[in-house]
């Protein structure tokens, strides 16, 4: 979340910057709450000073043998008023904190200003989409040729937006995840993690999914115990590993990676991408997280994005990189690059990775800090996250870009070591 000092000292500037994201900050409400907070705080401080003075007078009066009953009554009255003032102050602060939890991050000055995805800026492209000399099939039709993709069986088990993978296609899906993990751990310096797929609410609040986006999550209610949520991304579990910690400067940067299933309700996606594997309730993803010194986070974002790009380059899949505009960035990001891979059947690029610098936004929620050797004091770290990559969408891209006229699929060269001698999926 944002630093509350910004709302006290630069409220209108913050409101103007948030407006570029399409977010309307209720300035009047915040000003009203701040005025009440200051008034109550001033009153309680005055009462505390008066109470201290009265308490001192009691001792003096008692030493002189004077009647202390009126003074005692005054002190008791003030104690009651102080308790009421503290309750009121706590209520005001809780309301301000609640507002803070709903406010998105401030965009970096380098982020293009815009209202929607139409205003995103293309940064670069890699590779050239293949010109097929036959009528191409989409991944659903290709899956039917081999029998390796079965959406009907999945619907029988779980309903819409699920898939059953079989045989060589299931193995190809696994190969992709293994290849990604091996690349990031072997060449990019990440440490592999296996984390819980179920987390509690504080973890999701720490990374910004709660309270604002609860409808996008799958929740497991437990009577008498804390609720569980299925993770929407391993960003949640990986980033929260540093919650409440004070890291030594020598530990930074932390580079963490995990391969997990992800679970999303897709509450706002009704009618979109209903065919195939593009938008699923359950999908696998390899997630990269970095925890860095604040001065190095923008440089780290470029490196994180390059790590995700390397996966696509080695798979020889054409892609482009977009700098997201202010109106299209995620809730917690100060700057985001999206990677979009070429999907032949749709004749366009589709998102396959989102790489974001969240600044100290998540760290403040989680109280994740490092000890700055220059000051000797704990300070907030910066956190970054990025898909490296979404496994299901990468499978879609491989199936479609490596298809042959008969519906068979060539196995990309870098995946052959994982395929047990299978070079063509028929």
Curated annotation (Swiss-Prot):
Q: Which UniProt keywords apply?
A: Aminoacyl-tRNA synthetase, ATP-binding, Cytoplasm, Ligase, Nucleotide-binding, Protein biosynthesis
What Gene Ontology terms for biological process does this UniProt record contain?
selenocysteine biosynthetic process; seryl-tRNA aminoacylation
What's the Enzyme Commission number for this chain? 6.1.1.11
Residues annotated to bind ATP: 264-266, 351-354
What PROSITE patterns does the record point to? AA_TRNA_LIGASE_II
Please tell me where L-serine binds in this chain: 233-235, 287, 387
GO molecular function terms listed in the Swiss-Prot or TrEMBL record? ATP binding; serine-tRNA ligase activity
Task: Name the catalysed reactions.
Answer: tRNA(Ser) + L-serine + ATP = L-seryl-tRNA(Ser) + AMP + diphosphate + H(+); tRNA(Sec) + L-serine + ATP = L-seryl-tRNA(Sec) + AMP + diphosphate + H(+)
Record's function text: Catalyzes the attachment of serine to tRNA(Ser). Is also able to aminoacylate tRNA(Sec) with serine, to form the misacylated tRNA L-seryl-tRNA(Sec), which will be further converted into selenocysteinyl-tRNA(Sec).
Please provide the record's free-text comment about the domains of this protein.
Consists of two distinct domains, a catalytic core and a N-terminal extension that is involved in tRNA binding.
Assembly with partners or alone: Homodimer. The tRNA molecule binds across the dimer.
Recorded family membership: Belongs to the class-II aminoacyl-tRNA synthetase family. Type-1 seryl-tRNA synthetase subfamily.
Q: What name is this protein filed under?
A: Serine--tRNA ligase
């Amino acid at each position: 979340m944002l630093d509350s000092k910004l709302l006290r000292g630069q409220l209108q500037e913050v409101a103007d910057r948030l407006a570029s994201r399409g977010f309307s900050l209720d300035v009047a409400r915040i000003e009203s709450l701040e005025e009440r907070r200051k008034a109550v705080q001033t009153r309680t401080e005055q009462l505390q000073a008066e109470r201290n003075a009265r308490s001192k007078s009691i001792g003096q009066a008692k030493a002189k043998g004077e009647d202390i009953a009126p003074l005692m009554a005054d002190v008791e009255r003030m104690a009651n008023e102080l308790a009421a003032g503290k309750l009121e102050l706590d209520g005001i602060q809780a309301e301000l904190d609640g507002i803070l939890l709903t406010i998105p991050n401030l965009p970096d000055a380098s982020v293009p200003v815009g209202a929607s995805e139409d205003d995103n800026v293309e940064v670069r492209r890699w590779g050239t989409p293949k010109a097929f000399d036959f009528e191409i099939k989409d991944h659903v039709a290709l899956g039917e040729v081999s029998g390796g993709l079965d959406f009907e069986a999945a619907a029988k088990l779980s309903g819409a937006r699920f898939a059953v993978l079989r045989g060589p296609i299931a193995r190809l899906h696994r190969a992709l995840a293994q290849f990604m993990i091996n690349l990031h751990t072997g060449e990019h310096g990440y440490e592999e993690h296996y984390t819980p797929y179920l987390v509690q609410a504080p973890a999701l609040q720490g990374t910004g999914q709660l309270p604002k986006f609860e409808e996008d999550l799958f929740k497991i209610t437990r009577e008498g115990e804390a609720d569980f949520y299925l993770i929407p991304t391993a960003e949640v579990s990986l980033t929260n590993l540093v919650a409440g910690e004070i890291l030594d400067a020598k530990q930074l940067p932390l580079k963490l990676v995990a391969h997990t299933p992800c679970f999303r309700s897709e509450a706002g996606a009704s009618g979109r991408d209903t065919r195939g594997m593009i938008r699923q309730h359950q999908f696998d993803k390899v997630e990269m997280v970095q925890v860095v010194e604040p001065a190095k986070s923008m440089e780290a974002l470029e490196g994180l994005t390059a790590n995700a790009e390397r996966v696509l380059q080695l798979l020889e899949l054409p892609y482009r990189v977009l700098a997201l505009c202010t109106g299209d960035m995620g809730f917690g990001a100060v700057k985001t690059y999206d990677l979009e891979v070429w999907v032949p059947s749709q004749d366009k690029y589709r998102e396959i990775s989102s790489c974001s610098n969240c600044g100290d936004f998540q760290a403040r929620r989680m109280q994740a800090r490092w000890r700055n050797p220059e000051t000797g004091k704990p300070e907030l770290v910066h956190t970054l996250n990025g898909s490296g990559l979404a496994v299901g969408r990468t499978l879609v891209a491989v199936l479609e870009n490596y298809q042959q006229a008969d519906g068979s699929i060539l196995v990309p060269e870098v995946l052959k070591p994982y395929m047990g001698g299978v070079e063509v999926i028929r």
